[in-house]
Regions:
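Hydrophobic face of amphipathic alpha-helices that form TPR/SEL1-like repeat modules
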Residues: 1-70, 90
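Glycine-rich loop-to-alpha-helix module at the N-terminal edge of alpha/beta enzyme cores
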Residues: 55, 61, 66-136
């Protein structure tokens, strides 16, 4: 049906979880925080769907705990910037020509994952990376 307009879901804020002592969300978050602090993550660049690593890395520390390295990322050079721009420009037309419903469904799927099975992981990463508390 080419003339059909897809229904747009009404926007709603996610419920604010209480993170009360012994609550499931608090246990999940504490587990995820401990897991993320126990690993040093290697963060490559992604260019044209491929992982790109360099010998030039930069360490990442939580702002509230500068003695604890949590990751390092691979620093790009001018050639990486040009490769990334070229790839993005090639993808732009494909994205622009995609039906808006398909583009919207990608963002809705991401929102479902972030608010569902990956909620504790996103919260833990944000808390460690930006020194936020669970309510921020």
């Amino acid at each position: 049906m080419p003339n059909k307009i897809a229904p747009i879901p009404s926007p709603q804020n996610e419920p604010i979880l209480g993170y009360l002592p012994n609550s499931n969300e608090r246990k999940a978050l504490k587990t995820e925080l401990a897991r993320r602090k126990s690993v040093i993550y290697d963060i490559p660049m992604f260019i044209n769907g491929k992982e790109v690593r360099t010998n030039d890395t930069v360490d990442i520390f939580p702002p509230h705990e500068l003695s604890h390295k949590i990751a390092h990322y691979h620093k790009g050079k001018t050639e990486h910037i040009h490769q990334a721009i070229d790839t993005a420009l090639k993808a732009r037309d494909k994205w622009a020509n995609m039906h808006w419903e398909d583009r919207a469904s990608i963002f809705l799927k991401a929102a479902d994952l972030i608010s569902g099975p990956y909620r504790a992981a996103i919260n833990a990463a944000t808390m460690l990376g930006q020194s936020k508390n669970v309510y921020q």
